Amino acid sequence: MISPGLDVIHPLHRRADTGMRSCRQWLCAAALISLLPLLATIRAEAAVGSDSLNVPAAMNDAGVPVPVIGVAQVGGALVSVGPRGLIQRSDDGGHSWRQVPSPVSSDLVQVRFSDERNGWIVGHDSVLLHTSDGGGSWQVQLDGRRLLALLQDWYGQRAEDGDAVADDMLREISMAMNTSATPDVLAAPFLDVLFDDRGHGFVVGSFGMILHSRDAGATWEPWIERTDNDRRMHLYGLDERHGVFYATGEQGLLMRLEPQAGRFVALEVPYGGTFFGVRALDGLLLVHGLRGNLFASRDDGQQWQKVETGLDSSLVSLVERGGQLVAVSQGGQMVAVNPNTLAVTSLQPVRVGEIYAASLSSVAEDMLVVALFSGARVVAIAKAD
C-alpha cells in the first residue's frame, strides 16, 4: 500500500505551506531518512496488486542483514522491527536474530513492552500490533481501515448531538480522505505506544494523532481534541510514571496528562526544536531532541535546566544503565548522565553508521543494541579515551 501522504487529521488550511517541512521532520524522527530509497522501492513493489494491511510480511533469507528501525528488551530477549512488516527476536543479547511472522507488510517503526508477555508495535498505515506471549506471535489491534471507521463513528455520533468540535473533526477527516490514494484507509503513521501496568495507554503519531485505551488496546477512543495541540504538531514520544503520561512533539512540544481534567496540557520548555523522546523518573523529567539537546526538570516541568551533552546530532534514545542514563545520538555519539547531579561523562563513540534507536543488551549491562540500516548490532559502552 502506498501511503496517501501525511496530510491527515490536521487543519489543512493552517499548515499547507509547511507540508514538506513537516514531512521531512517526521521522517527524521521516525529514523527513516537514509531508508527512503529502500522504502520507495518497497512501496512501489507493494502497490502492484497487494495490500500491506492484509498481506503478511515476507520471510527474509536467514543471515541476510535487513534494516532495523526500532528495538526493545523483553525479559532476557530483544525484539526489533523494520520496513515491510519486519519483526525479529534475539535470545542471545542481539548477536543473532530470527524473523517472527508478522500479519502486515506495512513499515514498522517502534516496539514497546509493558511486561514480559505484553507488547505493542506501531508503524505506517496506522498499524498497531499486540503480543501476549513475549513477542513470539503478533495480532493486529488497529490499522488505517479500523481507525477511519472509529473516528467517523466516534465524532459522527457526537456531531449529531450538536458537538461543534466533533463536527470540525469530521470535516478534517473528510478533507484528508478526499485526497487519499486509498480512500478506505487513514494512513497516518503511528510513532509510539505505551501502556502502564493497569492496561491504560496511548498511541500517538503524525499531525497530532492520539488515541487512548483503558483495556490494553482492545478498544480505543480518540483524544485528538483533548490536548493542548491545536496546531496538530506531530507527536513522537511517550513515557509514564505513577499513572501520569507525557508526550513529546515538534517545535518544543511537551505535554503532561492531567487525569482529573482528562486531557494533555502543554508544559513550557525553553527550546523550540523538536523533542523526539521523554523520560519520566522519580523526581526527574527529561526531554531529548535535535542537535544533542537534553533538558531536565525536578519539579514536573515547572523549571528546566539544559544538560550540556556536548553532542551535535539528534538524540534518539535515553537508556537506563547501572543507575545512569546513556544518551545515544543519531551519529553514534554517546554520553552518560548522572540523574542525581546531571553530570555528563563522555563515552566512546561507535562508528557503525546512522543509529535509529538503542536498547540495553538483554545479557550484558556494558553493551547496547542499536538499530541500523544494516540491521541490529551490539556495541560496547565504554568511557572515552
What role is predicted for each listed range?
Residues 4-30:
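Bacterial N-terminal signal peptides that target proteins for export
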